[in-house]
Amino acid sequence: MEPAAKTNPRMMRLGLPMTIDVWRNARIDFGATALFSLFNVVLNQFYVAFAIQEGASNVQVGLLTAAPAIGLLFSPIWASIMERSNNPKPFVILPNVIGRLLLLLPALFPTPSVYVAVAIVFQLLMGIQAPAYASLVSRIYPSDVRGRLMGYVRVSMGVLMIPLAYVVGNWSERFGPSGPLIAAAIAGTISIILFNSLHLPKQPPLQGAGGSKKARFSFKEQWSLVSGNRILALFLAATTLSGFGNMLSVPLYQIIQVEVLQLTNIQIGYTRVAYFAALLLTFLVAGWMIDRIDIRYTLLAGIGAYAVVPMLYGLWGTYPAVIVGNAVQGIGEAIWDIGIMAFVLRIAPGREAVVFGIHLLLFGIRGTLGPMLSTSLTTTVSLPLLLVVASLFGWAGTLLFYWGNRKQQL
């Protein structure tokens, strides 16, 4: 790669020095992300609400919320296979093409069981691509500009998602969810096809692992990375506690919005506008922070955000509290999106897929147990009490990350 770097001069784009290939990748990433924005709004902000409106029970809401985590339970296995293949791109592209087209099914067959089945299959596919994407990003952008470019790309998505949340809310309120679901499937598929045109630098062949011939999965090998790295172990413990609190809460947010407060799709759209506005601003600020100061300060804010949101819902539970809670949730999710990936890339260079796979496995466990536990308890425990307990998990994770990292050097 050294000779290539010498023959590929740097230029200034977006206030950053980058090569022609990096600038080309950034433009492709911007375009693909713009198209993905509609898919993201429909799937992540309205899908569960659509299912509830179609008659989904609390248990089905729990399954819908747990679906992303169920898919990630197998991420370490896929991470091991991908790492030995030394080519993450197919592991990102193919699952996304299939998964995004699946959104056509609930549009054509709008029953709660179809919503649940599609969500689980889609997230199983995302469990394949998630660790591969972490490795792919490390090849798309160099480390000196990665945080800011990732932030800029997410900002562009946030700019589009703010009006899209309002549009989807109005569209579905007037004509039902089928139209937004079909449009999301089409836009998402075109997006991943465009993303496939990214240029990746050539990688040296794997040394000593036997390449793809020995794509064996080993928990011992993967967890050995954690046992010898205190910072990584603290990170995993803190995100597990805070993330468990978040996953306990997420299905309860949907139940409160639709069943308790009986918000219309237009009102839900306004809460999503608050979410995306905060997401947008945080992507911009967090990307700048990641490249300039100790990344653990940024992560601390993201971990703490997941303690604040259930407290707002549990102690107040009004429509204004929902709007503020959505904004704080946007802050947390933006930091978890780019902050955690940047953190893993920094502390485990070359092994980011495996470490990210472990992180996703833990998310899979807490994300499966959390929603199922909270929704099953709704008949015997009050929603405010469940949310306060979830908030306590978030605060425990925040304090652990803070105290554990006070004297540690990254």
What are these regions (language model features)?
Residues 45-49, 53, 80, 84, ...:
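Transmembrane alpha-helix termini and helix-breaking/packing motifs in multi-pass membrane transporters
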Residues 128-141, 335-348:
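Intracellular juxtamembrane helix-capping segments at the cytosolic ends
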